């Protein structure tokens, strides 16, 4: 007999039971556990819904990874599996053989079905398989603990599809018996009120990544924010609100790209990224109030910060340990920046990246920030490009960076004296001014990578390089 014979015999036995419709809960109780995955795959492919229901009731493993088998949602299959679970969760005394703790609808574990399909069955003993299926990401439950259903949600329509609608309805009527767990929730299009109702049905501690995209308005932030306070394991919070037609692509890079690009990075944990919110005015406080854990990064782009919003930046513990602060395309020329200075003082010992880009900060406002900025000794990146400052104000700024020895990249605007009446750089004027600014800087420290003026260079398209002295492109 060949080495593949045991696997083949198990497969044939399961096929025979299915095709001759001999399958009952009693026959399943007598079958070896090795038969179940093969039989389940066979019943799944043959659309034997009654058999699926019975096998769920007798499932001998801690976890049923249905999502990796059901690549395309199929309502009748889901209904059959949930009917099988119905019989179990309603029983006070659970069947002798039942071990199922998790129904996994995530498309993440093809390994289970590959092993038991025979491709690698001989390299994995039943004992090893038992260890594999301990559901490491879910603590072992007691006899009367709720069943857990795992699924990742990506909501691209304003309403749920038929499978999700059925699943959420099924869970709603079994509160206390079933917990819906979603480690990642993405909302692209569902209205705010519907999304809040959906969040109420998800076990909040299970959410680790939450993305809310443009069609959800923040005009009712006070009603949305309390849900955040319940998400004790939340690591990534991404908010992008607005009504413009935009293209976003989520990627994972070792650093956050320039935020003018259409690429948004969700790499860093404990990051709050808010972009293009048309009506966040005086609502930012609601969000910060309910964030219990300190953020590592706070990124705010293409929006308006009212004075009250600016004041709250330094008041909440969630922003007290920032390593990265990016305020981009925010008009600040009439804003009181003393609260921002207070925030910089608070995070001076931890802040490594500071971006105040295209904020139209003017000389009086810049001077308010300088004392706090001079204390940010851990800064490695400082981007002050796109602001409206004079040459003397920039000199003052450079002198205040005396103690910032770790700065590796600095970007500054062309001073107002080098701009024409249209706001364009006059390179003949900028060149000697830039040289004078460099002399001022070298009096207090030696820079590494630094750039004055338009970024990138309008002539050659170059970005900051390793060179300290930049040539004037001809």
UniProtKB/Swiss-Prot annotation:
One of its GO terms (cellular component) is cytoplasm. Keywords: Leucine-rich repeat, Repeat. GO terms for molecular function: ubiquitin-like ligase-substrate adaptor activity. LRR repeats lie at residues 97-124, 179-203, 204-230, 231-262, 263-291, 292-323, 324-347, 348-375, 376-400. The keyword Repeat applies. Coiled coil: none annotated. The keyword Repeat applies. It comes from the Eukaryota. Gene3D superfamilies: Ribonuclease Inhibitor. One of its GO terms (biological process) is negative regulation of DNA-templated transcription. Belongs to the PRAME family. This is PRAME family member 33. It comes from Homo sapiens (Human). The lineage of its organism: Eukaryota, Metazoa, Chordata, Craniata, Vertebrata. The gene is PRAMEF33.
